[in-house]
UniProtKB/Swiss-Prot annotation:
It comes from the Bacteria. One of its GO terms (cellular component) is cytoplasm. PANTHER family: 12S RRNA N4-METHYLCYTIDINE METHYLTRANSFERASE (PTHR11265:SF0), S-ADENOSYL-METHYLTRANSFERASE MRAW (PTHR11265). S-adenosyl-L-methionine binds at G32, G33, H34, D52, F79, D100, Q107. Keywords: Cytoplasm, Methyltransferase, rRNA processing, S-adenosyl-L-methionine, Transferase. Pfam families: Methyltransf_5. Its main location: cytoplasm. Its EC number is 2.1.1.199. Specifically methylates the N4 position of cytidine in position 1402 (C1402) of 16S rRNA. One of its GO terms (molecular function) is rRNA (cytosine-N4-)-methyltransferase activity. This is Ribosomal RNA small subunit methyltransferase H. Belongs to the methyltransferase superfamily. RsmH family.
Length: 310
């Protein structure tokens, strides 16, 4: 079962300024925490469309929210297809869209999914079980240079070269098949003093591989642009990020769409295509409260940004 503790629940949904008869999209259904709170605020005229690429999450939510009937619609898809899937449902604009970019706890805690460095399991890390690329492929087939690049760019790992060298040397004799084997190689690549600080030594590399397997940053960037297009004037987009790379994409995208570019002086009016699309609701990100951090350790790196369509 999905017993995912939802992060920044009220702040994210309340930040959408819910209209009871509106149409909303939860791009990251997961355990259904945000969806549950959002549905409770809708009248019969309102509806929620929820995306997830995980079949278990979809089935769980269908059971959990069956009493809402046609007000609750699930879409088994990556949110990169947001606009296409909504158009298939005959929806061309919505009142609000939310993204929670954390890996849901059940995925982390299901050993066989291979997301966690705490369990020994096959190297998988696919959010979508029908996708072809796995963590096994990345670790065993990608070149030393490719591994260094993703460890450094996606994981911000200082010892990227040393870890990639350990992986390269090991796989000359034997394929790296499990998360446990990979964790040991990562530890060998990090000097002992550094292993004792900054959390689990495998955290950054596992994050990097997960992002690469699921093409997460490119997918999010495309989906966020789609969300901005799909939201009605006065509608909002709420985004929870969990690491600096995602937050940078969100911050940059919101900023670019909420500012007027440098135009020639003396223009009598600003052409429509240069008018800002968004108004920032949060100048600085909203962070979890101390109480929430005590109750849910996984919330510590969460940041919430909200913008409104002009």
């Amino acid at each position: 079962m999905f017993n995912h503790v939802t992060v920044l629940l009220k702040e994210t949904v309340d930040g959408l300024d819910i209209k009871p008869d509106g149409t909303y999209v939860d791009c990251t259904l997961g355990g259904g925490g945000h969806s549950s709170y959002l549905l409770s605020q809708l009248t019969e005229g309102g509806r929620l469309i929820a995306f997830d690429q995980d079949e278990i999450a979809i089935q769980n939510a269908k059971e959990k929210f069956s009493s809402y009937g046609e007000q609750f619609i699930t879409v088994k898809s990556n949110f990169r297809y947001l606009s296409e899937k909504l158009q298939e449902l005959g929806i061309t604009e919505v009142d609000g869209i939310l993204f929670d970019l954390g890996v849901s706890s059940p995925q982390l805690d299901t050993p066989e999914r291979g997301f966690s460095y705490h369990h020994d399991a096959p190297l998988d890390m696919r959010m979508d079980q029908d996708a072809s690329l796995t963590a096994y492929d990345v670790v065993n087939s990608w070149s030393y240079e490719q591994l260094v690049r993703i460890f450094f760019q996606y994981g911000e790992e200082k010892f990227s070269k040393q870890i990639a060298r350990k992986i390269e040397a090991y796989r000359e004799n034997k394929a790296i098949e499990t998360t446990g084997e990979l964790v040991e190689l990562i530890k060998e690549g990090i000097p002992a003093p550094a292993r004792r600080t900054g959390g689990h030594p495998a955290k950054r590399v596992f994050q990097a591989i997960r992002i690469a397997v699921n093409d997460e940053l490119k997918v999010f960037e495309e989906a966020l642009e789609s969300a901005i297009e799909m939201v009605k004037p006065g509608g909002r987009v709420s985004v929870i990020t969990f690491h600096s790379l995602e937050d940078r994409i969100c911050k940059t995208t919101f900023k670019r769409n909420s500012t007027t570019p440098q135009l020639p002086p003396g223009l009598p009016i600003i052409p429509d295509e240069f008018k800002p699309k968004l108004k920032l609701i949060t100048r600085k990100p909203i962070l979890p409260s101390d109480i929430e951090l005590e109750e849910n350790n996984r919330a510590r790196s969460a940041k919430l940004r909200i913008a409104e369509k002009r």
